From Swiss-Prot:
It is found in: Cell membrane; Cytoplasm. Keywords: ATP-binding, Cell membrane, Cytoplasm, Membrane, Nucleotide-binding, Protein transport, Translocase, Translocation, Transport. SUPFAM superfamilies: Helical scaffold and wing domains of SecA, P-loop containing nucleoside triphosphate hydrolases, Pre-protein crosslinking domain of SecA. This is Protein translocase subunit SecA. One of its GO terms (biological process) is protein targeting. The gene is secA. The lineage of its organism: Bacteria, Bacillati, Bacillota, Bacilli, Lactobacillales.
C-alpha cells in the first residue's frame, strides 16, 4: 500500500513538473499579450485556427492560447488567472482531473483549456451538476469566449430540438450531465438524421467530476414508455410483507431455525425471505411453490415490497410531497425531480405510503454515466475532493487526479472528532457549540447526512431561538442564495450532504477576525470525500476557519461498521456514564477505517456495474451503429435486406426439413411461406413432395427478387422505395431492441441466483446476454422478412 501511495505521489510530482514548464511559457507571453490592442488580441483566434489547419497541434499552441485567454479574462471579466490556475488549466487540457480546493477559482481555471480546445471547432462541453450552474457559468464566462470570437451555447431541458442543435453546434456548450446523456439516447431513437441534435462527442470538462463520475456512476439514464401494470399486484404484495417479522439472528448462529420471515444484510442493503417467509407467502397466496415459473411476477412484486418497506427509508431515501414519492439523492441531499426508481420499486414505495400508484415504465433506451462519458475523445474534470477516489478515476476513466497547489497557505483548523454515546447527547452538544459561536457573531455551517437530521436540528435551534436557514432536498430553489449568505456575520446554515456545491461561501465584513466560517459535521458520511467537501467550505483562499465532526454510537456508519469496537473503547476510557465524551485521533482513525471499507465496497459495486453494463454497451454500439447506417443511407437498402431475408429463409427451411423427407414438417413449412413470404396461391404451386431443399430455397429467393421488382415498379420513385425500406427496418429494430433491453434487465435481476450453483454470475450474464442478442438479431431478420414481403405498398409512409 505504501508503495502505491508513493507511486501516486511521484506521478503527481512528475506531472506538475511537466505542467510547470508549460506554465512558465504561458507567463512568458504575458507582457506581449498585454501590449496588444483589443482588436489585435481578438485577431489571435482566427490566427490560431489557421495554424491548426496548417498542422500545428493544440499542445504547440497551448502557451500562446492560454496567454490570450488569460489576458482576455483580465479585460472582460476583471479576473487574471494565478499561476496555480494556469497549472490547473494545463492539467485539464491533458485529460486529467484537477483537484483544486474550494475558492481556488475552478470556473476561471477552465476558461483556458476551453478556449484552446474550442479552436478546433469540434465542440467543447462544459458539464455541471445542475441547470442553475450551467446558466450562471454560460452567462459569466460566455462573455469572455464571445469577446474572443467563439460561439457559446446553453443546453437545458426545456429547449426544443432546434434550440438544442444550435447550442451543440457552438464552439463551447454548457450543459448538465443528465441532459447530455438523454440527448445522446434521444439522438439514437430518431428516425431522420435531421432530428439529431448532438455532434460527435469531442472534449468535455466536468465540474464537480466526483459527483458525476463516482456518486452517480451507477445511476442509469433511462428513457421510458408506459407499460401496462395492475396496481392491485403491488397492493397485495405490500399488505403481505407488512405482516412479516425480521430475522435478527446472527448469520453464524448454531441452530438452523429461522427466527423471522425475512433477513436484511445492512452492509450490502440486501433483503430476502427466509424459509419461514416463503412458507407464509405460499399460504397467503394459496400456492404450492412460490418460485414456480407462473409465479415469477408475484415473486418480483414481493421482492420490491420487501425493499420498499424495510430497506428504503422515508425522509432519507425519498420524501413524500403532495401525494407523490420523490427520490432524494443520497450524496447531494437534493430531490431528484422527474426521477423514478425503475423495475417497480417506485410503485412498491407508493403502495407502502398509500399514495396513488403511477404506471410502471418500460425502458426504451438506457446508458450509465460511466459508459456515456467514456465515449468522449478527451475527458477531464475539476473537483475539490478527488484524491480519495484516484484509483477508480484511473482504472475506469484513465484519468489521473492531480492535486493543484493552493494560491495561499491553508489557515483552517481541522479538529479531531468528538464521540458521544447517544444521538441526544450529541445533538445537545452541537446546539451548545452553535450557541457559543453564534453569540460572538461567528457564522456556522452545520452539515447533516439526512433530511431527518437537518429537520431535528432546525427544531432544536428554533427552541434555542437561534435564527437559521435550512438547505436540503425539500428546499433547494433558493439554494445558491442561502449558501452565498452562509459566510455573513451571525449566519447559521444547516446543509444536507453539502447541497449547494458550486457556489462559494465568501466571508462577510469582520468575520475573519472572529475565526472565519465554523463548520460542524453532525455525522460522518460513508464517503470521506463528502466529509472533505463539507470541510472545504471553510478556509477558502487562505481564510481562517474551523471544522469539527460530532459523532455518536447511534450514527448509521457506527452501527454498520465497527460500532462495538468503539463502544468497548468508550467503556474502557470512562467509568462515569454521563460523561462519556471522547475527543481522540484514534476515534477519527477508526471512523476513517470504516469509511475506507465502505468506499472499497462501493468501488467494487461500481466496477461490477460497469462490467455488467459493458455487455449492454457493446450491444448498444452495434444496434445504434447499424441503425445510423440505415438512417443515413441515400440509396436502396436492397443489399442489406436481401441477405437478411435469405438468412431467415435458410434457417426456417433447415428447421422444418431435418432428417429424411418423411420427417419434414410440411404444414409448418407451408405456414411459414404463406404467412411470411408469398401468397397462398404461390405456396400451393410448390410441389413439396418432390422438391429438394436447395431447389426450394432457390425458388423462395426468386420469389423475394420478384417481390422487390414489383414493389419498385409500384412505387416508381427510388426515393419512395428507400423510404419504405427504412420504415420496415427501423420499426422492427426499435421494437425488438426495446424488448431486448427489458429482457436484459430481467436477466440482470435474476442472474445473482445462479451464483448459488457455483457459477460466476458475470460470466453467466455475458453468455446469456450474447445468446439473447443473437436471438434478437434472428427475430429482427424474421420480422423484417415478414413485414417487407407482406406489407402493402403505400405512398407517404411515415417512419
Amino acid at each position: 500500500m505504501a508503495n502505491i501511495l508513493k507511486k501516486l505521489y511521484n506521478t503527481d510530482k512528475r506531472e506538475l513538473k511537466k505542467f510547470e514548464k508549460y506554465a512558465t511559457k504561458v507567463e512568458e507571453h504575458a507582457d506581449e499579450m498585454s501590449k496588444l490592442s483589443d482588436e489585435q488580441l481578438q485577431a489571435k483566434t482566427p490566427e490560431f485556427r489557421e495554424r491548426i489547419k496548417n498542422g500545428e497541434s493544440l499542445d504547440d499552441l497551448l502557451p500562446e492560447a492560454f496567454a490570450v485567454a488569460r489576458e482576455g479574462a483580465k479585460r472582460v471579466l476583471g479576473l487574471y488567472p494565478f499561476h496555480v490556475q494556469i497549472l490547473g488549466g494545463i492539467a485539464l487540457h491533458f485529460g486529467n482531473i484537477a483537484e483544486m480546493m474550494t475558492g481556488e477559482g475552478k470556473t476561471l481555471t477552465a476558461t483556458m483549456p476551453v478556449y484552446l480546445n474550442a479552436l478546433e471547432g469540434k465542440g467543447v462541453h462544459v458539464v455541471t451538476v445542475n441547470e442553475y450552474l450551467s446558466s450562471r457559468d454560460e452567462e459569466e464566462m460566455g462573455q469572455l469566449y464571445r469577446w474572443l470570437g467563439l460561439t457559446v451555447g446553453l443546453n437545458i431541458n426545456s429547449m426544443s430540438p432546434d434550440e438544442k442543435r444550435e447550442a451543440y453546434n457552438c464552439d463551447v456548450t454548457y450543459s448538465t450531465n443528465s441532459e447530455l446523456g438523454f440527448d445522446y439516447l434521444r439522438d439514437n431513437m430518431v428516425v431522420y438524421k435531421e432530428q439529431m441534435v448532438q455532434r460527435p462527442l469531442n472534449y468535455a470538462i466536468i465540474d464537480e467530476v466526483d459527483s458525476i463520475l463516482i456518486d452517480e456512476a451507477r445511476t442509469p439514464l433511462i428513457i421510458s414508455g408506459e407499460a401496462e401494470q395492475a396496481n392491485s399486484d403491488y397492493i397485495r404484495a405490500d399488505r403481505f410483507v407488512k405482516t412479516l417479522t425480521e430475522d435478527k439472528s446472527d448469520d453464524d448462529a448454531d441452530d438452523d431455525e429461522d427466527h423471522g420471515d425475512y433477513k436484511i444484510d445492512w452492509p450490502t442493503k440486501t433483503i430476502s425471505l427466509t424459509r419461514t417467509g416463503i412458507e407464509k407467502a405460499c399460504e397467503h397466496f394459496g400456492l404450492k411453490n412460490l418460485y414456480d415459473v407462473e409465479n415469477q411476477k408475484l415473486v418480483h412484486h414481493i421482492d420490491q415490497a420487501l425493499r420498499a418497506n424495510y430497506i428504503m427509508l422515508k425522509d432519507i431515501d425519498y420524501v413524500v410531497q403532495d401525494g407523490e414519492v420523490l427520490i432524494v439523492d443520497s450524496f447531494t441531499g437534493r430531490v431528484m425531480e422527474g426521477r423514478r426508481y425503475s423495475d417497480g420499486l417506485h410503485q412498491a414505495i407508493e403502495a407502502k405510503e398509500g399514495v396513488k400508484i403511477q404506471e410502471e415504465s418500460r425502458t426504451q433506451a438506457t446508458i450509465t454515466y460511466q459508459n456515456f462519458f467514456r465515449m468522449y475523445k478527451k475527458l477531464s474534470g475539476m473537483t475539490g475532493t478527488g484524491k480519495t477516489e484516484e484509483e477508480e478515476f484511473r482504472e475506469i476513466y484513465n484519468m489521473q487526479v492531480i492535486t493543484i497547489p493552493t494560491n495561499r497557505p491553508i489557515a483552517r483548523k481541522d479538529m479531531p472528532d468528538i464521540l458521544y454515546p447517544t444521538l441526544d447527547s450529541k445533538f445537545h452538544a452541537v446546539i451548545e457549540e452553535i450557541k457559543k459561536r453564534h453569540a460572538k457573531g461567528q457564522p456556522v455551517l452545520v452539515g447533516t447526512v439526512a433530511i431527518e437530521s437537518s429537520e431535528r436540528l432546525s427544531h432544536l435551534l428554533d427552541e434555542a431561538n437561534i435564527p437559521h436557514a435550512v438547505l436540503n432536498a425539500k428546499n433547494h430553489a433558493k439554494e445558491a442564495q442561502i449558501i452565498m449568505n452562509a459566510g455573513q456575520r451571525g449566519a447559521v446554515t444547516i446543509a444536507t450532504n453539502m447541497a449547494g456545491r458550486g457556489t462559494d461561501i465568501k466571508l462577510g465584513p469582520g468575520v475573519k477576525e472572529l475565526g472565519g466560517l465554523a463548520v460542524i459535521g453532525t455525522e460522518r458520511h460513508e464517503s470521506r470525500r463528502i466529509d472533505n467537501q463539507l470541510r472545504g467550505r471553510s478556509g477558502r483562499q487562505g481564510d481562517p476557519g474551523y471544522t469539527r465532526f460530532y459523532l455518536s454510537l447511534e450514527d448509521d456508519l457506527m452501527k454498520r461498521f465497527g460500532g462495538d469496537r468503539v463502544k468497548d473503547f468508550l467503556d474502557r476510557l470512562s467509568d462515569n456514564d454521563d460523561e462519556k465524551v471522547i475527543e481522540s485521533r484514534l476515534i477519527t482513525r477508526q471512523v476513517e477505517s470504516a469509511q475506507k471499507r465502505v468506499e472499497g465496497n462501493n468501488y467494487d459495486t461500481r466496477k461490477q456495474t460497469l462490467q455488467y453494463d459493458d455487455v449492454m454497451r457493446i450491444q448498444r454500439e452495434i444496434i445504434y451503429g447499424e441503425r445510423m447506417q440505415v438512417i443515413e443511407a441515400d440509396k436502396s437498402l436492397k443489399n442489406v435486406l436481401i441477405p437478411m431475408i435469405h438468412r431467415t429463409i435458410n434457417s426456417q427451411v433447415d428447421m422444418f426439413t431435418q432428417g429424411d423427407r418423411s420427417q419434414w414438417r410440411l404444414d409448418s413449412l407451408r405456414d411459414f411461406i404463406s404467412s411470411s413470404l408469398a401468397s397462398e396461391q404461390v405456396t400451393d404451386s410448390i410441389d413439396f413432395k418432390t422438391i429438394s431443399v436447395e431447389d426450394l430455397k432457390k425458388k423462395l429467393y426468386d420469389i423475394v427478387e420478384k417481390n422487390f421488382e414489383d414493389k419498385e415498379k409500384a412505387l416508381g420513385d427510388p426515393s419512395q422505395m428507400l423510404e419504405f425500406e427504412k420504415v420496415v427496418i427501423l420499426r422492427v429494430v426499435d421494437d425488438r431492441w426495446t424488448d431486448h433491453i427489458d429482457a436484459m434487465d430481467q436477466l440482470r435481476q435474476s442472474i445473482g441466483l445462479r451464483g448459488y450453483g457455483q457459477l460466476n454470475p458475470l460470466v453467466e450474464y455475458q453468455d446469456s446476454g450474447y445468446r439473447m442478442f443473437e436471438e434478437m438479431i434472428s427475430n429482427i431478420e424474421f420480422d423484417v422478412t415478414r413485414l417487407f414481403m407482406k406489407a402493402e405498398i403505400r405512398q407517404n409512409l411515415s417512419r
